[in-house]
């Protein structure tokens, strides 16, 4: 399902700020596997997730998802198959948009409420209700007004609106 072969990433190579973040890492996960990446601050956990998601190209190696080489695939194309929660609860949502608009965006509606049907809005409300934190009553509120925990819960819902092939949770509390 996910196969990482000999990837390496060095930031600022050849400078005094050179930092080897990942060196010759290989990993293989099969469908249904659950894995935890554990390490101290600065160990490269987020860098690994960033490489998988296409935030940057690795210096060496390859990344495959469902036997398809995604090493050079653009970030937006990878996002169709990868759901992600970031360490920072401020990432993963659009703070100036409403809860409903964020959910519409995650559902592939482009965030345009005029194209969101009544049935889709009801689906959003039902999914929010499952979180049991009252967000279903605040669908017209901007996401930027939510607490960090509420945003993390919303981001998890958004990341799984269309079930991803791979879900990355970049924080122990995520």
Task: Show the residue positions of the predicted features.
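Q-loop/switch helix immediately C-terminal to the Walker
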Residues: 96-109
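A short, proline-enriched helix->beta-strand linker immediately N-terminal to the Walker B motif
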Residues: 159-165
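Conserved ABC transporter NBD signature motif
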Residues: 61-69, 128
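Helix-to-loop junction immediately C-terminal to a conserved catalytic motif
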Residues: 53
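The feature captures the beta-strand-to-loop junction immediately N-terminal to the Walker
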Residues: 38-40
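ABC ATPase NBD coupling module
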Residues: 15, 57, 69-83, 95, ...
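Walker B catalytic motif
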Residues: 171-172
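A short, flexible loop at the N-terminus of ABC-type nucleotide-binding domains that lies
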Residues: 1-4, 10-24, 36, 72-74
